[in-house]
Amino acid sequence: MLGVFGSQEIIYMTRQYMAGDTPWNSTPRQLNGRVVFAEHYSMHPGHYTFTQKLGIATKVDVKKMFGKTPAERKKEFAEYSTIRTQSPVGFLAPDFELETTTGETVRLSDKRGQIAVFMFVAMTCPPARTQVDLWKELHEKYDTKDVQIFFIYSRERHAGERGYRELKETTSTSERMTHARMLSEITAVPVAVDPIDERTLKDYGMVPNAAFIIDREGFLVFKSQWADIRKIDQVLQQLLVSEELNKTNQG
């Protein structure tokens, strides 16, 4: 498998593998009177296995990534950094109203009384594609009366590159919906579509594969720059346990 890569690509993947995951404290804390969790930030998906990273590298043009100009890198870094400033943990999450691939409407404020969990995805975002099957398992694990899990389809990330030759950049909401329906064909997790103006992505941070957890009252309690099913599951379990403890104490 390594034979398909050049020397720069091998160096890139080795750095990714050696870096590993960045530290994350899973202990819940109180903020503004509610249970919240530490954010997880990283410029690279360090929690993926080496095999997963190899799979990701087969889908993208690593040389193109290396060939970005300083201005392009600066813009990319600025966009990725918005996840740190947009929609802070412990505060009311920005509301949104999005159409799903089945013609229904997903409105975050309608999820009050339930925990909402979502990840930004795209057909040409290999880290997100790596997570899709894992999120299906998570979707099946939790009762929908308590936890609502869904994807938000946003901008394409590696359109036309090595693993996605047939997929082009979307220039309209209808084109984005077409790509989102392709994703719906390979997952049972509901897929909502962010319009081409990217209003939802801008509200939550311009990151390709970020994940968010909103509590029953509509407050953001966890966000991760790269979706990691293990962290998501851990936070959900602790949230539900905390709710049960509160009920017991109040009873």
Identify the residue ranges that each predicted region occupies.
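N-terminal targeting signals for export/organelle localization
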Residues: M1-E97
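Short loop/turn microsegments at loop-to-beta-strand junctions
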Residues: A93-P94, I115-A116, V207-A210
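Structural microenvironment flanking redox-active thiols in thiol-disulfide oxidoreductases
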Residues: R129-E185
